[in-house]
Amino acid sequence: MADVFESLELLFDRPNEPLITPKGENNSVFQLTEQFLTEDYANNGIELNNRFGDDASEKIPLKNLSKLPEFKIATQLPKDAEFSLFLPKHQEMANELLGVLMDVPENELQDLLSTCAFARVNLNPQLFNYCYSVALMHRRDTRKVRVKNFAEVFPSKFLDSQVFTQARETAAVIPPDVPRIPIIIPRDYTATDLEEEHRLAYWREDIGINLHHYHWHLVYPFTANDLSIVAKDRRGELFFYMHQQVIARFNCERLCNSLKRVKKFSNWREPIPEAYFPKLDSLTSSRGWPPRQSGMQWQDLNRAAEGLFVTIDEMERWRRNVEEAIATGTVRLPNGQTRPLDIDTLGNMLESSALSPNRELYGSIHNNGHSFTAYMHDPEHRYLEQFGVIADEATTMRDPFFYRWHAYIDDVFQKHKESAYVRPYTRSELENPGVQVRSVSVETPGGQPNTLNTFWMLSDVNLSRGLDFSDNGPVYARFTHLNYRHFSYRINVNNTGSSRRTTVRIFITPKFDERNVPWIFSDQRKMCIEMDRFVTVLNAGENNIVRQSTESSITIPFEQTFRDLSAQGNDPRRDELATFNYCGCGWPQHMLVPKGTEAGMPFQLFVMLSNYDLDRIDQDDGKQLTCVEASSFCGLKDKKYPDRRAMGFPFDRPSSSATSLQDFILPNMGLQDITIQLQNVTEPNPRNPPMSV
């Protein structure tokens, strides 16, 4: 019999299929009672369930609940509808369901299994999957339950819609024990290079990048009845920093592709020239995602079904109030009092999360911006159209307009950082007395000195867990993505003092702007992308620090982005892999390095060894934890953010004196010119399953 953790994991399997059918690779069947049957299966559900059970390798009994949970709001979402947290009505539904799942008494796991099974049977599969994932991450008794890879459970959110007809044919015709040829996904399936934004499709539509965004919002939801789920340490600041780094990385990629930095969307009444045709179909709704034509505009939203009533006038009023808060350095509270504005508060105001200090006054600018864009084609629900990809956390980064909108959001944060209420760093805050960086470099095995190399890779993703109503057995899709040759940082440091700890902060930045001229510091600081941050010990005298690119505190390993959960069932690292539920929101390892150019694009490597006395947090540093990957973007579970400095330090604010990055350098910092060169070759991923040929 499957243990309760394995049974909970099976609730992710084939989300659009009813629970009466077998789940998982072992053909496991939940033994349902009348309590768990919907009206559709009231007459023959038990008989069907028993028939499936005759062929099952294991049967999972479900405990009858003494009191059935009530879902007065959540049941209003049809099972074949799309779900979006940006919609007020859907937020209410999620809060109701999440509250029920969190309220099951701790360690009553059979009750939890039955409650979750009842919710899965009766509610929309996407709504259930989101709330179930958040609950598993935030309940103390389910930390060993692995949240399944969202791209494998809902593959239609990530892959060309044409794939699924071929996938069903493969599943139906080829026996599971026969090697199956992967279905090839073309690199250019959403547009051609006649559309200049398509040059960035490899980045915007990357499965790992979109999983990163979805997973980050699972770990940091902006709404819940239980505020402890939302109120994590420096949550609003992390919303700023994660998205600021996304925009900086996107702008680096634009320069690599001979495009200008993204233009912020600040005039909310002008036409939007960026079109997007996603070429995705939803397996939940059996409809295609709506495209956006060039030249469409935001319009007032009046959609009763989603509880979405908001006007552009309201958005502009909220913007004026936020601008006033930045200009005065104060936030007005509902009771009329004020308090100082800081970056964490501003993040919660702008998103806005349940922690917003005054939602009536400051509104929900970020979230409604997504909704305005997602409903331009049907703002009044006249044509019964669903939202566009920008309103789904798993698909939003595919849309070119996502970056224009977030360039505006980031600009608001930057105005705060540049205001009179955020002072530039003093020399004593930046320096590390007695520490001198003599040289910094990067080294790629077999490569040129101070040169990073990127290339294309073919990787497989298993579709079978999300391929409803088809035979078991793996069905692979093969897609092309960017990758890089692993490298090491080498830092030579002289420490004239005694042995001490230091935080090593590593960034890279393009050397020239889009006009091919050197940057001014006020612009270049916003283009600095964090590559790594770690604490190390400096001995007295000379120190040679070597750090592998794969150890980055920004990223999660490739295996965790595209992890095969079925293979982890008996893995001795099960607890460690389950902790991925939390830290899995990190940046994908294969996208750590910008693409560069075939000729080689000039970048600069910046390394800083900061004063640990000003960095340290009085808690365990996380090294005793099984999962410390991606702490820069994800924090540490149930702990404070592992760095006392402002996120993005030392580039999060202007300098009082430096006009260039070279001017900014102090003895405890190093700057080195490097080159990023694209090797325009495509290689198969050695991790691809052996049966894919």
From Swiss-Prot:
Subcellular location: Secreted
Residues annotated as binding Cu cation A: H213, H217, H243
Organism: Bombyx mori (Silk moth)
GO biological process per UniProt: defense response; melanin biosynthetic process from tyrosine
Predominant cellular place of this UniProt entry's protein: secreted
Lineage of the species this protein comes from: Eukaryota, Metazoa, Ecdysozoa, Arthropoda, Hexapoda
Oligomer and partners: Heterodimer.
Record flagged with keyword Glycoprotein: yes
Described purpose of this protein according to its UniProt entry: This is a copper-containing oxidase that functions in the formation of pigments such as melanins and other polyphenolic compounds. Catalyzes the rate-limiting conversions of tyrosine to DOPA, DOPA to DOPA-quinone and possibly 5,6 dihydroxyindole to indole-5'6 quinone.
Protein name: Phenoloxidase subunit 2
